């Protein structure tokens, strides 16, 4: 599976087997499968191999700059949007999300709502489209703009929001598999609400409520974004609930300390995998390496320990995990006041900053991951500009083959690190 290139590439370029969507003029009207009409505004970004447009319900007037929706359009024979649609249609309909929120007495849930989809013919070509909520900026921009550090209170609050999101999608048979700051977007109208987007790698881990069994596939090693992806993914195992929580843990630790210990060798996925294996086996040493000052947030160790003991098919105790993060807030004399403060962080000194090497992303094929019993299809994104709804994905060259490890149970044995970076794997 090809790695993912670093951000900042300005010119879009797709692999030969993928087609880029042509740009539609403002005012183009699309009709979804429910016969509802939507009017396109200007193109405001590119996501994967599709274009993003401002949009509104069809009316006599133009689509203005404050339009509440965006529409993603891709050539119909491309795979990424097809796979996202499978998740949205099964798990993100507004009434489904609304019923969950009511049952949990929640003010909001950070899962984007599905508003419609369909096909559109233009110049003899057929396109697939999906209507989504419009969002604001992504957390990666805020993280970098804040010196690559968030306050402890903010990180714990984001963790609580993520647990709400993950419990919902997990209980609706899916896992996300690519949690990271660039996939977390603020609401367009409420800066205290954050949403998890980009379900191109979302995997239906439990069709009809039955979790799939642990199985390694050497051809699918290192799926996801390499610095955050789970140990299971490094070993070619299909995404799971415990994997989502492991990824979430790496994200929270990075937000607190600026970078993870393996971030200077992202070009060597085996080194990254083996580093994570060692860190899982000695969580205390892992956290010491992240927080050089010794001011280690105790809740991070407890959180990672809970994730460590989860079996591949286990249902996480979301309430227990929430309790760990809430106790962390209490230890700093704070509570979850539902207000997200992205101001200057006050965490103690941690690891020195380094330049982040190229990242890696899976290529998603035309078949949806939830349509097969095999490991989820990989995806590759084309480089693009990022404008709206965090629409920025990139492609990378091929990786070297990975040596398969022996698997006796759902908890793989630790292998020694190769310790040597290798170019662009």
From Swiss-Prot:
Gene Ontology cellular-component terms listed: Cajal body; cytoplasm; Golgi stack; nucleus
Gene3D superfamilies for this protein: Transferase(Phosphotransferase) domain 1 (1.10.510.10)
GO biological processes: cell division; DNA damage response; Golgi disassembly; neural precursor cell proliferation; positive regulation of protein localization to chromatin; signal transduction; spermatogenesis
Gene Ontology molecular function, alphabetical: ATP binding; protein serine kinase activity; protein serine/threonine kinase activity
Pfam families in the cross-refs: Pkinase
E.C. number(s) listed in UniProt: 2.7.11.1
Localization per Swiss-Prot or TrEMBL: Nucleus; Cytoplasm; Nucleus, Cajal body
Positions annotated to bind ATP: 44-52, 72
Cited SMART domains: S_TKc (SM00220)
InterPro entries found in the cross-reference section: CK1_Ser-Thr_kinase, Kinase-like_dom_sf, Prot_kinase_dom, Protein_kinase_ATP_BS, Ser/Thr_kinase_AS
Keyword set, alphabetical order: ATP-binding, Cell cycle, Cell division, Cytoplasm, Kinase, Mitosis, Nucleotide-binding, Nucleus, Serine/threonine-protein kinase, Transferase
Class of enzymatic activity (EC top level): transferase
Reactions that this protein is recorded to catalyse: L-seryl-[protein] + ATP = O-phospho-L-seryl-[protein] + ADP + H(+); L-threonyl-[protein] + ATP = O-phospho-L-threonyl-[protein] + ADP + H(+)
Region (Disordered): 343-425
Domain Protein kinase stretches: 38-329
Alphabetical list of PANTHER family matching this protein: CASEIN KINASE-RELATED
Protein task: Serine/threonine kinase involved in the regulation of key cellular processes including the cell cycle, nuclear condensation, transcription regulation, and DNA damage response. Controls chromatin organization and remodeling by mediating phosphorylation of histone H3 on 'Thr-4' and histone H2AX (H2aXT4ph). It also phosphorylates KAT5 in response to DNA damage, promoting KAT5 association with chromatin and histone acetyltransferase activity. Is involved in the regulation of cell cycle progression of neural progenitors, and is required for proper cortical neuronal migration.
Family statement: Belongs to the protein kinase superfamily. CK1 Ser/Thr protein kinase family. VRK subfamily.
Protein name (database record): Serine/threonine-protein kinase VRK1
Organism from which the protein derives: Danio rerio (Zebrafish)
Lineage: Eukaryota, Metazoa, Chordata, Craniata, Vertebrata
């Amino acid at each position: 599976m090809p790695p993912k290139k670093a951000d900042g590439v300005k010119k879009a370029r797709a692999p030969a087997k993928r087609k880029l969507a042509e740009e539609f003029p403002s005012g183009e009207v699309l009709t979804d499968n429910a016969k509802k009409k939507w009017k396109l505004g200007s193109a405001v970004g590119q996501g994967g191999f599709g274009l993003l447009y401002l949009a509104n319900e069809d009316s006599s007037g133009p689509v203005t700059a404050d339009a509440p929706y965006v529409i993603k359009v891709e050539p119909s024979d491309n795979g990424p949007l097809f796979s996202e649609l499978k998740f949205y249609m099964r798990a993100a309909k507004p009434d489904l999300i609304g019923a969950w929120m009511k049952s949990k007495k929640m003010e909001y849930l950070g899962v984007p709502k599905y508003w419609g989809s369909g096909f559109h013919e233009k110049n003899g070509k057929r396109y697939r489209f999906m209507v989504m909520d419009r969002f604001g900026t992504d957390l990666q921009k805020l993280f970098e703009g804040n010196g690559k550090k968030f306050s402890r209170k903010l990180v714990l609050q984001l963790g609580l929001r993520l647990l709400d999101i993950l419990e919902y999608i997990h209980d609706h048979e899916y896992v996300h598999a690519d949690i990271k700051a660039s996939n977390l977007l603020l609401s367009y109208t409420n800066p205290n609400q954050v949403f998890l987007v980009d379900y191109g790698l979302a995997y239906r881990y439990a069709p009809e409520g039955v979790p799939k069994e642990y199985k390694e596939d050497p051809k699918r090693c290192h799926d996801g974004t390499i610095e955050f992806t789970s140990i299971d993914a490094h070993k070619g195992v299909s995404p799971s609930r415990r994997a989502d929580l492991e990824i979430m843990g790496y994200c929270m630790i990075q937000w607190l300390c600026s970078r993870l210990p393996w971030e200077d060798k992202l070009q060597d996925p085996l080194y990254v995998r083996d580093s994570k294996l060692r860190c899982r086996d000695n969580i205390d040493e892992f956290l010491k390496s992240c927080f050089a000052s010794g001011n280690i947030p105790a809740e991070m160790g407890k959180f990672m320990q809970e994730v460590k003991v989860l079996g591949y098919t286990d249902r996480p105790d979301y309430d227990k995990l929430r309790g760990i993060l809430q106790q962390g807030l209490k230890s700093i004399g704070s509570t979850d006041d539902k207000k997200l403060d992205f101001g200057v962080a006050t965490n103690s000194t941690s690891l020195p900053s380094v330049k982040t090497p190229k990242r890696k992303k899976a290529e998603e094929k035309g078949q949806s991951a939830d349509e097969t019993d095999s490991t989820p299809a990989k995806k590759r994104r084309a480089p693009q500009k990022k404008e709206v709804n965090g629409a920025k994905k990139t492609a990378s060259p091929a990786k070297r083959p990975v040596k398969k490890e022996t698997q006796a149970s759902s908890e793989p044995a630790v292998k020694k690190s190769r310790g040597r970076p290798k170019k662009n794997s």
